[in-house]
Amino acid sequence: MSAHKVQIGLSSGQFRVALQVPSVRLKGLGSFHTGSIVLPSQGSLREDQISLHNQDGLHKVMREVLGYERNSYKKFFLR
């Protein structure tokens, strides 16, 4: 039984969050399909840059795990 992983890495000024299993369940966040996003360190994040099937699930991960506010696309930070 393989573990579910959420990888957070910093590369070339961008944060990449990769959900690497067909479905991911994080405690308190529910489950959602796999996908990946690249969050720019500066500028804004457009909805069409998000390649995750369940965007609500993604926003929960961004907010709860990463400390990224859904309505504040101007800044990204790790809590």
From Swiss-Prot:
One of its GO terms (biological process) is defense response to fungus. Keywords: Antibiotic, Antimicrobial, Fungicide. The keyword Heme does not apply. Residues 1-56 form a propeptide. Has antifungal activity against C.albicans. Has antibacterial activity against the Gram-positive bacterium S.aureus and the Gram-negative bacterium E.coli. Lacks hemolytic activity against rabbit erythrocytes. This is Ixosin. It comes from Ixodes sinensis (Hard tick). The lineage of its organism: Eukaryota, Metazoa, Ecdysozoa, Arthropoda, Chelicerata.
